[in-house]
Amino acid sequence: HPRVRRQRQMCIRDSITTKFVILQLNMSKFELTSEYKPTGDQPEAIEQLVDGLRRGDKAQVLLGVTGSGKTFTVANVIAEVNRPTLILSHNKTLASQLYEEMRGFFPNNAVEYYVSYYDYYQPEAYMPTTDTYIEKDLAINEDIDRLRLRAVSSLLSGRRDVVIVSSVSCIYGMGSPMALSENVILLKKGQIIERNELLRRLVQSLYTRNDLELQRGTFRVKGDTVDIAVAYNEIVLRIVFWDDEIESIEECDPMTMQRIAKFDEYQLYPANLFMTTQEQTNMAIKAIQDDLMKQIIFFEELGDSIKAQRIKERVEYDMEMIKELGHCSGIENYSRYFDGRNAGERPYCLLDFFPEDFLLVIDESHVSVPQISAMYGGDRARKTNLVEYGFRLPAAFDNRPLRFEEFEAMTDQVIYVSATPADYELEQSEGVVVEQVIRPTGLLDPEIEVRPSENQIDDLLYEIQQRIGSDERVLITTLTKRMAEELSEYLLNHEIPTAYIHSLSLIHI
């Protein structure tokens, strides 16, 4: 029931608040850093948006033309209201650009990046028309995985000066806030704790011991010294014991092991976003077995022994892997059992880690909103064949992105940012539209000319030569990546300095 889920969510957030009350006593404020001051339509737009948030408006639209400085306006609003903020973008490239810009505006605050950590992802699928089963295949980017962990760690810390720039990954399932917060390790100088107890807690937080090579998410032990390669940061945490007392806590450079900083108190966050215990695993296996028997009986009653045998073999193999190794391929399809959720209940996601008064900014909302609403349907359609043909249990349906109405229910106040807001945003804002038309640069929109496609390359060469003669530059857009490459080669053959760019290289992380 929605009310029960809401109460449960509040309890989770309350537990996080209680656990990290120490840091909340020292809440940081946003410090906006910029050599520019708001100009053009920006000052009025900032004032209107801030007034709307303080007035309690649930939705506002920032309608700004291209180049009017909408990102700078949003940064000023964030600094003014001083709330944890989620900025949602519809693709990784734009998210990375926003992340870089926000890091520049808030160098002293927690600006984080949360997108899919797959460099390559082929989802599991079954096509009944050709009887083709496609196994899941993927490649994980370790740097992005680290940034995702850091984003969640910043939220768990209880600090208020957090901006997270995310793609639609923020509506996909992850571990529960309760499980993650319970596995945070609080260390204090002078604390009495047995070394082996610390090692046990590290393993419980999914750090693994490796005394030979210290890699991200591992730890090593040398006498009274425990070195931990923190999973969410590029540092090594060194804990030195004197008998059963923590003598010192230091952050060290992972390459040189030179000390970077000393601490009297330190919070170490888990090495993975999906936490579980042996007790939860045992309960999950029992629940999986029960549902497996129901599904076998279901297929047998339909007279389909092939599907019954298929689901039996696949699930029993998965359970054996979970018992032996603690995981299996496609373990996410059993997430409901490990989380203790009921059938149909939404998964935990990044939004669960935010306080209730967080600010949501949806960039390019005319594209992002339809994308959010489409995620559930696409996921459901793919998994329907897997379940109906005996490749997965029905619980696979519950490893999913949020439905759009679930996403809406989890948000408090939203700013939709777009040059062309759609009907949905305008309806939600009930006419509260903040316009930003005058650019800080004073530049006007260029005059648009539509020319015939005949002899377009010759016409293009003529225009390029005109610009070169004026010591100016030219930007050409093409329909496809291949066209960009071929046109670039053609222009180079005509001795015109040219470079194509059709995807941004990974931002420096």
Q: What is the meaning of each model-derived region?
A:
Residues H1-D14, I507-H508:
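Single conserved hydrophobic/aromatic residue that forms the stacking wall/gate
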Residues S15-L23:
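Short, positively charged and aromatic/hydrophobic N-terminal segments
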Residues N26-I507:
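ASCE RecA-like P-loop NTPase motor cores
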